[in-house]
From Swiss-Prot:
The lineage of its organism: Bacteria, Thermotogati, Thermotogota, Thermotogae, Petrotogales. It is a multi-pass membrane protein. Residues 30-110 are periplasmic. Binds 1 zinc ion per subunit. It is found in: Cell inner membrane. Acts as a processive, ATP-dependent zinc metallopeptidase for both cytoplasmic and membrane proteins. Plays a role in the quality control of integral membrane proteins. Zn(2+) binds at H425, H429, D502. This is ATP-dependent zinc metalloprotease FtsH 2. In the central section; belongs to the AAA ATPase family. The keyword Hydrolase applies. Disulfide bonds: none annotated. Gene3D superfamilies: 1.10.8.60, 3.30.720.210, P-loop containing nucleotide triphosphate hydrolases, Peptidase M41. The chain crosses the membrane at residues 9-29, 111-131.
Length: 630
């Protein structure tokens, strides 16, 4: 006899389906049997009898009377049996009407009750079946509360080591002790050393937190249990706590091992926020996690690693010594780190001989590891699309632009007058980027629409990584932001909506200068900010200003004056270089793209030389751009 519970559980499904089919067939037959019967009143029945239409009667003791007409039509009426007295029945029989009495056994009452109860019975069987299936790892999401959703990655398959991680040498050094402990915990125990129970990896998205954790597991050659913080919280209260206990139990059984919890803030947020109460499911899960991290012995060879983008909102009990002792921050990679990361992602890819990895790294400031990987893959896809056997520098440049602003939208139709405005707008940014001494160098100018909103853009990239920005650099940056609007007003004597985002960014930067960085003589070196309230109650709801209304007016007035003076400076510089601006506009309008090197060369030319350079170019056909917008 097979006593396998899974085998018995697998039989419930077919039986459940057969039961539903049988009930549906039964209900269909019952419906067919009653669909041809017409409900009438007792008076109508008497009239039909008097009209000699009825040929037979069936009288139920419960008061149900069924009558059959000569044409086969069936009628049904409920009437007290006292109305059908003996004398009346005999009279009917004498008239040739067949009268039959039926004893009611109560079967119809049970059938009626069963029909009413059928939906509830089906629902109960359905839930019972799904819960039985959930025990074997099947069933609906949320009902599968008995299953531990942690995914185990075998370090021997698809192994990742520190050789696959670049640009974070300091992080590797911090994690070397963890690797050595997992390889040989007895060596640490002999010296009386205790390894940290937990390692918290924090940093911006895409900086490689998960990759680092898997590299530690690969270096130590131990099992790696991966689970997202949101996986702990499910439909039923107590499920998350049970999963925490199951996760640690399984890791202990396969120690040494690494438990990695991604997006820890999903389950580890600060408690007692007033939302959900003390018995909130997430808080119960967090309590279970705190208990488990206190309960296991570090000598067991279990290391808990977690990643989050928001360490500031984690519960303080989770960060105290004895739980997540070691805290490691992964920052956005600098120039050298980007160069090393690009080299790793170029492994196994055919690239042209003239590819300069350092130049690619310089062209991608602010890119994190995930962006760089996406950029290299995008370049490979572009080369494959053109059926080329290697990746060229043009592929990489196009891939960088795709990552920053999206793919070119060649199908978007721009009218000639809109194209003129976009041309002058972008050159307003670019010319000021060259003229202002502290502005970042221009890398590329294009009027080809990209992404959702960009009708064109001017790419300015710093020549080196900067960690501090001076006041003159910020001021020149603001003037450059206003260059697009200034060019529109100078050339066409009107402005468009294209400068909306520029104004927004410039205003935000000026507000930060005035109110927080102390770069205003009138306001002074004081940080006028806002005190942020509880994150979980909503920042805007509980945010309080730490300055008076009078101070707010002074700040707004200073911001306005600074924006207006910067705008005047932008217009003056562009007006002084109007002839050069017009020649550059003719060139950009026809070519649609200007590289940073070519733009610099054109800005260094005198006006006559620039005029010959532009008008003698074979691609320049339209030259009458700036006479009138209309």
């Amino acid at each position: 006899m097979n006593n396998n519970p899974n085998r018995r559980g697998s039989l419930i499904g077919p039986l459940f389906i057969y039961f539903i089919l049988a009930m549906l067939i039964f209900m269909s037959i019952s419906q067919l049997n009653t669909s041809n019967i017409t409900e009438i009143s007792y008076t109508d029945l008497v009239n039909l009898i008097n009209q000699d239409t009825i040929i037979s009667l069936q009288i139920d003791t419960s008061g149900l009377i069924q009558a059959k007409a000569k044409n086969g039509q069936l009628f049904q009426v409920y009437a007290p049996t006292l109305l059908m007295d003996q004398a009346y029945v005999r009279a009917l029989a004498n008239d040739g009407i067949k009268v039959e009495y039926i004893q009611n056994t109560g079967a119809s009452w049970w059938v009626t009750m069963l029909i009413y109860m059928l939906p509830l019975i089906i629902l109960m069987f359905f839930w019972f079946w799904m819960f039985r299936r959930s025990g074997t790892g099947e069933g609906i999401p949320g009902a599968n509360y008995r299953r531990n959703p942690a995914r185990r990655y075998d370090s021997k398959r698809n192994k990742i080591t520190f050789n696959d991680v670049a640009g974070i040498d300091e992080v590797k050094e911090e994690l070397e002790d963890i690797v050595n402990f997992l390889k040989d915990p007895k060596n640490f125990s002999a010296l009386g050393a205790k390894m940290p129970k937990g390692v918290l990896l924090s940093g911006p998205p895409g900086t490689g937190k998960t990759l680092v954790a898997r590299a530690v597991a690969g270096e130590a050659d131990v099992p790696f249990y991966f689970m997202s913080g949101s996986d702990f919280v499910e439909l039923f209260v107590g499920v998350g706590a049970a999963r925490v206990r199951d996760l640690f139990k399984e890791a202990k059984e396969n120690s040494p091992a690494i438990i990695f919890i991604d997006e820890l803030d999903a389950v580890g947020r600060q408690r007692g926020t007033g939302l959900g109460g003390g018995h909130d499911e997430r808080e119960q899960t967090l309590n279970a996690l705190l208990v488990e991290m206190d309960g296991f012995d570090p000598r067991e060879g279990i290391v808990v690693m977690a990643a989050t983008n928001r360490p500031d909102i984690l519960d303080k009990a989770l960060l105290r010594p004895g739980r997540f002792d070691k805290k490691i921050f992964l920052d956005v990679p600098d120039l050298r780190a980007r160069e090393e990361i690009i080299k790793i992602h170029l492994r196994g890819k055919r690239i042209a001989d003239d590819i300069d990895v350092k130049s690619l790294a310089q062209s991608t400031p602010g890119f994190v590891g995930a962006d760089l990987e996406n950029m290299v893959n995008e370049a490979a896809l572009l080369a494959a699309r053109d059926n080329r056997d290697h990746i060229t520098n043009d592929d990489f440049q196009e891939a960088i632009e795709r990552v920053i602003v999206g793919p070119a939208r060649k199908s978007r139709k721009i009218t000639p007058k809109e194209k003129k405005v976009i041309t002058y707008h972008e050159l307003g940014h670019a010319v000021l980027g060259y003229l202002l001494p502290y502005a970042d160098p221009v890398h590329k100018i294009t009027i080809v629409p990209r992404g959702q909103a960009a009708l064109g853009y001017t790419m300015q990239l710093p020549s080196e990584d900067r960690f501090l920005i001076t006041e003159p650099e910020i001021k020149d940056k603001i003037v450059g932001m206003l260059g697009g609007r200034a060019a529109e007003e100078i050339v066409f004597n009107e402005i468009t909506t294209g400068a909306g985002n520029d104004l927004k960014r410039a205003t935000e930067l000026v507000r930060e200068m005035v109110a927080q960085l102390g770069m205003s003589e009138k306001i002074g070196p004081i940080a006028w900010g806002e005190e942020e309230g509880e994150i979980f109650l909503g920042r805007e709801i509980t945010r309080m200003k730490n300055f008076s209304q009078e101070t707010a007016k002074e700040i707004d007035s200073e911001i306005k004056n600074f924006i207006l003076s910067s705008y005047e400076k932008a217009k003056n510089l562009l007006s002084e270089n109007r002839k050069r601006l017009d020649l550059l506009a003719i060139y950009l309008y026809n070519k649609e793209n200007i590289s940073g090197k070519e733009f610099k060369k054109m800005m260094e030319m005198d006006i006559e030389e620039l005029n010959d350079y532009v008008l003698k170019d074979k691609d320049v056909k339209e030259t009458n751009l700036f006479v009138s917008y209309a």
